[in-house]
Amino acid sequence: MGRKPTKIKIIPLGGLKEIGKNMTIIEYKDEMIIIDCGLSFPEDEMLGIDIVIPDITYLLKNKDKIKGIVLTHGHEDHIGALPYVLKKINVPIYGTRLTLGLVETKFKEHKLSNVHLQRVEAGATVDIGEFKVEFIRSSHSIPDACA
């Protein structure tokens, strides 16, 4: 009998059928990476609420499996939830120069200092645990975006 193939799980925690809260989990074997970590802004009827972040319950239950967060670009709907998530799950963050510059500013506002930022050039490939992540330059309304 042949070996049973290992499955890849793709789990969107936000950003599907909505604007904002972009966050996707890729799970393989016993490891996970997070793609983006965004927020959204409240609907008109959500009085008293300033921001909305994805539900990270699944991440908290599996935080030992998380190997890193990969950022595609520096818009709030892709990086805005980072300070809230990193207070509970501190893992390395991978992104391009401008993206990480915006992240650093956000962390200063939130008084976060014990973070590991890993700068990656567009076109580079990075090994993150079981994952091989290629940063492909992408055209977007903000410079230094990657897919």
For each of these PLM feature ranges, what is it?
Residues 6-9, 32:
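Extreme N-terminal starter segment of soluble prokaryotic enzymes
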Residues 2, 98-145:
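Metallo-beta-lactamase
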Residues 8-12, 16, 20:
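Extreme N-terminal flexible tails
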Residues 18-21, 28-71, 84-91, 95, ...:
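Pre-active-site segment of Zn-dependent metallo-hydrolases
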Residues 21-26, 126, 146-147:
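Short beta-strand scaffold segments in enzyme catalytic cores
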Residues 10, 26, 36, 73-74, ...:
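Divalent metal-coordination and catalytic microenvironments
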Residues 78:
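N-terminal Rossmann-fold NAD(P) dinucleotide-binding loop
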